[in-house]
Amino acid sequence: PQPGWALIQSSSACVQLVSTGVYNTAMIRVESCAMRADLKGKTLFVTGASRGIGRAIALRAARDGANVVVAAKTDRKHPKLPGTIHETVEEIEAAGGHGLAIRLDIRDDAAVTEAVDQAIQHFGGLDIVINNASAIMLKGTSELPLNRYDLMFDVNVRGSYVMSRACIPHLQKAANPHVLNLSPPLNLNPVWFKDHVAYTIAKYGMSMCVLGMAEEFRQDGIAFNALWPRTVIATAAISILDDAVKPENCRTPEIMADAAHAILRQDARRCTGRFFLDEDVLRATGTRDFDRYAVKPGAPLMRDLFLD
């Protein structure tokens, strides 16, 4: 394994960030919140939903009979990667949900506003926002091209901020509204900064949005939470990590989808401003068989970034 990656076995507990604002294993505690039955009739807006974790979250909600806005920056097939927003919508419809494909670059403020308006016009409201779209480049300060720095900040931090901001007026009208950012707990161990400080700051920016917006909109009853994988997930992102991560040491996106599904069913007024790990959420809800999420059952798993 490369520095910053470790082979791990499973552990338990439901993760919550406590008042110090620093992630540490001593601060983890188990907590259960009341859950609603399912997401039937709810409307979700999912960014980066043409493949990977975004697609998996969309399909899990669709099985409940949810409405899902499938957004991604292109509606054309990628030459090397599977999936388009239109194919995801077809899968949503087949799973029992209702889908709407929207080509959206979240760096474009006007396009974000237009996309949200289109979603409201089509489905009549909005209940849940999944800020999944993200850019990654694990390079040090001297090696990272500045245009890639700009891309990570424009997509990860600013894009999630703008997306949330555009949706808040509609979420204020919803019953049990949630915003879920796919971002890590705020671990200030310097090891997570030294090799890719720009990416770390960009992802932590998403997490800081969770902290700030959870407090800002607490009285409105809008939940802002974060979800992060305990182990690396087999998505297109691992292809840029060369040999640092092998697919057989990963889990599938479905573990994140099931964990997100559990979080989104919780009472928004009671469950906000928290940082969850996928495996821990599912353990807290009774899941014991995690081999079904493994790309290769029985193989050692690679711990994800930002987790000691």
Model regions: which residues?
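C-terminal helical subdomain
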Residues: 226-227, 243-308
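Short-chain dehydrogenase/reductase
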Residues: 28-123, 136-137
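A short, exposed helix-loop element centered on a Lys and neighboring polar residues
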Residues: 164-165, 211
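Catalytic loop of short-chain dehydrogenase/reductase
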Residues: 172-173, 177-219, 230-232
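Substrate-binding pocket helix/loop in short-chain dehydrogenase/reductase
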Residues: 140-141, 145-150
